[in-house]
Design a protein with these regions (language model features):
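Stable alpha-helical structural segments in soluble proteins, enriched in small hydrophobic residues
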Residues: 159-167
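Conserved structured core elements
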Residues: 15, 157-158
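Residue-level detector of short, conserved catalytic/binding motifs and their immediate flanks
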Residues: 19, 62, 161
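ATPase catalytic-site recognition across NTP-hydrolyzing enzymes
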Residues: 1-12, 17
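Mg2+-dependent endonuclease catalytic cores in nucleic-acid-processing enzymes, primarily RNase H-like
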Residues: 28-153, 172-189, 196-207
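Generic recognition of flexible, low-complexity loop/linker segments
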Residues: 7-11, 21, 51-55
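Anionic group-transfer/hydrolysis microenvironments
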Residues: 13-15, 69, 164
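Short beta-strand scaffold segments in enzyme catalytic cores
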Residues: 19-25, 165
């Protein structure tokens, strides 16, 4: 169960050939959990938006990350896909599209580290129900002409990893720790801070 207080993101790669969408939560330590997947082809934008909204439910999303090409105007409507998603109730955020830097960032998220209990882990964890991400990510190969990039064929293998790349390119933030200290509406009610370097540090922590 993902706590309600964690920051939640939706990241997607959209096309008629495939919609790959992932809901990701980031905890207080900065670990990310990919906890839900939508992987379906032949969805027009209104159908895709309807499914995304239904699966999100009452969850509050920090951002919905999507590739920059969704902001290109479509010849049939004169509107961009991002604008059409907005009309359906989904405001997209343009993710960075530097492929190489995105893969570098994803490798950092996947490298072995220690979790909050000191056990071997990675900063990015994938729930078992995200079957297509688990299936396609390990099959992604290096591009023969640019080993720093991932191959774009077979194309079916690229949708889920690309969606994940947009997430890490968006520089997701960890969940803010709850501030249990009392807040004061007026400065005159705030306790006087001690002088010196310690006092400066404490004042910085209050805001």
């Amino acid at each position: 169960m993902i706590p309600k207080t964690w920051r939640r993101y939706l990241t997607l790669d959209y096309g008629l050939d495939m919609l790959a969408a992932y809901w990701i939560a980031v905890d207080l330590q900065g670990f990310a959990y990919v906890y839900r997947e939508l992987y379906e082809k032949d969805l027009i934008i209104s159908e895709a938006a309807e499914k995304l909204l239904a699966m999100t439910g009452e969850e509050e999303l920090c951002r919905i990350l999507a590739p920059p090409d969704l902001w290109n105007r479509r010849q049939d409507s004169g509107k961009s896909a991002a604008a059409l998603f907005y009309e359906q109730g989904l405001r997209l955020t343009r993710a960075g599209n530097d492929r190489v830097q995105g893969w570098y960032a994803l490798k950092e998220w996947l490298k072995p580290c220690r979790d909050e209990w000191g056990r071997p882990a990675a900063k990015l964890r994938i729930f078992p129900n995200c079957k297509n991400l688990i299936r396609t990510l390990p099959q992604l190969c290096h591009d023969e002409k640019n080993p720093n990039d991932a191959a774009q064929s077979p194309h079916e293998l690229t949708h889920a990893p690309d969606a994940l790349r947009y997430f890490v390119s968006g520089r997701p933030q960890e969940t803010a720790r709850p501030d249990r200290r009392p807040r004061f509406e007026f400065d005159s009610l705030r306790p006087k801070e001690p002088e010196g370097a310690l006092g400066l540090l404490q004042r910085q922590e209050v805001f």
